A protein has these predicted regions:
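Short gly/ser-rich anion-binding loops that grip negatively charged ligand groups
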Residues: 8-9, 21-28, 56
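Short, charged low-complexity intrinsically disordered segments located at boundaries
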Residues: 15-19, 48-54, 100-101, 149-153
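Short, structured motif recognition centered on aromatic/hydrophobic residues
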Residues: 2, 18-19, 114-124, 133, ...
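Acidic, glycine/proline-rich low-complexity segments that act as flexible tails and inter-domain linkers
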Residues: 3-7, 31-113, 142, 158-159, ...
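Generic hydrophobic, aliphatic-rich segments that mediate packing or membrane embedding
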Residues: 1, 14-18, 34
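Short basic/hydrophobic patches in alpha-helices and adjacent helix-turn junctions
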Residues: 123-124, 138-143, 152, 156-159, ...
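Short, low-complexity cationic-aromatic patches
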Residues: 10-16, 26, 30, 106-117, ...
Length: 179
């Protein structure tokens, strides 16, 4: 599938960024084999030398940049999210802001609109993430990936994820569109 993606215009940087984006949503244990596959494809098939051009700025304040990304994607209600809520679980909200959004969403190679579409796919494909899938469908719509576009994305993925998860994804899109 990497060769097909490449032939349809997905660049090596975009391939790597899609895999990196997956880590926060699927976990490194599920993503690592795909990172290896992408690296082998880039080196062995395309003949490029790794590492590719760096897509992040190691000098950025991850927490600050992560919050900026969350606000840009979801709206002002995300300001202060990293320090809000139950003190017993605030560390997870902080990790989400500085790791998921500060480390991944702030990288180059893909914009917010692309990352949100990809994130929505990761969430609905794995199932069991309905609240997050609705939130990210809503973020997609907010960024310009409208309901019709998201339904086309789901339609393209039916062979890979099956009908039950595809129907659940459409339900999430419809709920997000009503909010």
């Amino acid at each position: 599938m990497l060769k097909a993606a490449y032939n349809f215009g997905v660049t090596p940087v975009e391939m790597k960024e899609i895999v990196y984006q997956a880590v926060a949503y699927l976990g490194i244990g599920r993503v690592f084999p795909f990172l290896k596959a992408v690296n082998c494809f880039i080196e062995d098939t395309l003949g490029l030398k790794l590492p590719l051009e760096n897509q992040n700025d190691p000098n950025t304040n991850r927490l600050e940049k992560g919050e900026q990304a969350q606000v840009a994607i979801f709206g002002e209600e995300m300001r202060g999210y990293a320090t809000s809520g139950d003190p017993k679980t605030v560390h997870i909200r902080k990790w989400l802001t500085d790791n998921c959004f500060g480390d991944y969403y702030t990288r180059g190679g893909l914009d917010y609109k692309q990352r949100e579409m990809i994130t929505f796919c990761f969430l609905y494909a794995q199932g069991g993430c309905k609240p997050q899938a609705i939130a990210h469908a809503k973020a997609n719509i907010r960024l310009g990936n409208d309901e019709a576009f998201l339904i086309k994305v789901v339609s393209q993925n039916v062979p890979f994820v099956g009908y039950p998860r595809s129907l659940n994804a459409i339900d999430c899109i419809e709920k997000a569109g009503k909010e």
